[in-house]
């Protein structure tokens, strides 16, 4: 039988939220070249050897995860999701992961470090067993998706939400730690822009996962929740070791582990599950770095949150009131 091909009809909503996510993704689109990084050089020269080493490695680890999410994760999930608009949003997000986020880290490297050091840190990525393990676990679930199988797709979506809303944050911690102290500010602006993107990526894929989950029997729901918690624990145990490997030399492992647990709970909430870890106080310096309200900076030195594109507006809780959005439509 000849296959009938249909076109994407953007004049008709596929659901209550996808076009809103499309609009938000487009509104906050940015490019690495829009952020000048030379202003970080003076601070960088005064950092200790261990501080520079940890900073380079956390960004290299983030680069690997963004590369795999852009090249493998989002495209595979998009392939198995129904709906042209949903596929478009996922593919837009995939583009941001590698072409924008990963490239941004390379721009930071090229500004702060010589070629030899950059090559060494990318070799470290291939050799670090904890980093490789989490990449293997996540990518393995992407590649395990079976055609017309919602359960394997749900599991891959859980992995995607964990990557975007949980695993990235051991790497985000250190740039935010400096940013919250007013150091390495240009690099910190890039991290805040990436955080803004990852926030909506995690929420969107989480909503798609919840659709699948909510269609299941109570017995199947229990099984899927058990899978999600088991995967969380496996990733968490590996993340603890990864954190010690990176942050022991700068004395911040204890703080980073709190931040990891905080974001693991956020990832679970994106999936519609209750928090798993107890609530803890997060380092106020890092929370200050996470404050994405508009900052007053010189127009020509920074883009980030202090630079106003005509079409960009900061992400707010109101952006996720889907019922209100539907009524307006």
UniProtKB/Swiss-Prot annotation:
GO MF entry, a single one: metal ion binding
InterPro entries reported in the protein's UniProt record: Ferritin-like_SF, RNR-like, RNR_NrdF-like, RNR_small, RNR_small_AS, RNR_small_fam
Induction: Part of the probable nrdI(ymaA)-nrdE-nrdF-ymaB operon. Expression is constitutive but low, dramatically induced by thymidine starvation which requires recA.
Residues of the active site: 105
One Pfam match: Ribonuc_red_sm
Residues given in the record as Fe cation 2 binding sites: 97, 164, 198, 201
Cofactor: Fe cation
Note on how the cofactor is bound: Binds 2 iron ions per subunit.
GO cellular component: ribonucleoside-diphosphate reductase complex
Gene3D superfamilies: Ribonucleotide Reductase, subunit A (1.10.620.20)
Keyword field: Deoxyribonucleotide synthesis, Iron, Metal-binding, Oxidoreductase
SUPFAM superfamilies from the UniProt entry: Ferritin-like
Reaction catalyzed: a 2'-deoxyribonucleoside 5'-diphosphate + [thioredoxin]-disulfide + H2O = a ribonucleoside 5'-diphosphate + [thioredoxin]-dithiol
BP-aspect Gene Ontology terms: deoxyribonucleotide biosynthetic process
Effects seen without this gene: Essential, at least the last 3 genes of the locus cannot be deleted; could be due to polar effects on downstream ymaB.
Binding site for Fe cation 1: 66, 97, 101
EC number(s) recorded for this UniProt protein: 1.17.4.1
Function: Provides the precursors necessary for DNA synthesis. Catalyzes the biosynthesis of deoxyribonucleotides from the corresponding ribonucleotides.
PANTHER family tied to this protein: RIBONUCLEOSIDE-DIPHOSPHATE REDUCTASE SMALL CHAIN, RIBONUCLEOSIDE-DIPHOSPHATE REDUCTASE SUBUNIT M2
SUBUNIT field: Tetramer of two alpha and two beta subunits.
Family: Belongs to the ribonucleoside diphosphate reductase small chain family.
Descriptive protein name: Ribonucleoside-diphosphate reductase subunit beta
Lineage start: Bacteria, Bacillati, Bacillota, Bacilli, Bacillales
Underlying gene: nrdF
């Amino acid at each position: 039988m000849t296959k009938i091909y249909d076109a994407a009809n953007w004049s008709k909503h596929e659901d209550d939220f996808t076009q809103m996510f499309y609009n938000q993704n487009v509104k906050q689109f940015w490019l690495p070249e829009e952020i000048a990084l030379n202003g970080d050089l003076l601070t960088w020269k005064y950092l200790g050897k261990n501080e520079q080493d940890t900073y380079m490695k956390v960004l290299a680890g983030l680069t690997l995860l963004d590369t795999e999410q852009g090249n493998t994760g989002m495209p595979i999930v998009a392939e198995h999701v129904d709906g042209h608009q949903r596929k478009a949003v996922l593919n837009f997000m995939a583009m941001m992961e590698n072409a924008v986020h990963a490239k941004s880290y390379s721009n930071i490297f090229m500004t702060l470090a010589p070629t030899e050091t950059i090559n060494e840190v990318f070799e470290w990525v291939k050799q670090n067993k904890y980093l490789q393990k989490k990449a293997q676990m996540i990518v393995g679930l992407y590649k395990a998706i079976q055609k017309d199988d919602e359960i394997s797709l749900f599991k891959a979506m859980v992995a995607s939400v964990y990557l975007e809303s949980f695993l990235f944050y051991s790497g985000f911690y250190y740039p935010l730690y400096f940013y919250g102290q007013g150091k390495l500010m240009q690099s910190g602006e890039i991290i805040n822009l990436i955080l803004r993107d990852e926030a909506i990526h995690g929420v969107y894929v989480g909503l798609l996962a919840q659709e699948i989950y909510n269609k299941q029997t109570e017995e199947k729901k229990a099984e899927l929740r058990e899978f999600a918690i088991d995967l969380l624990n496996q990733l968490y145990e590996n993340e603890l070791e990864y954190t010690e490997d990176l942050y022991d030399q700068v004395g911040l492992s204890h703080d980073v582990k709190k931040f990891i647990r905080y974001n693991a709970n956020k990832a679970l909430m994106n999936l519609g599950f209750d928090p798993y870890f107890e609530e803890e106080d997060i380092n106020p310096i890092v929370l200050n770095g996470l404050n994405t309200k508009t900052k007053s900076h010189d127009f020509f030195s920074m883009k980030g949150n202090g630079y106003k594109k005509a079409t960009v507006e900061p992400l707010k809780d109101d952006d996720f009131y889907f019922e209100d959005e539907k009524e307006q439509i």
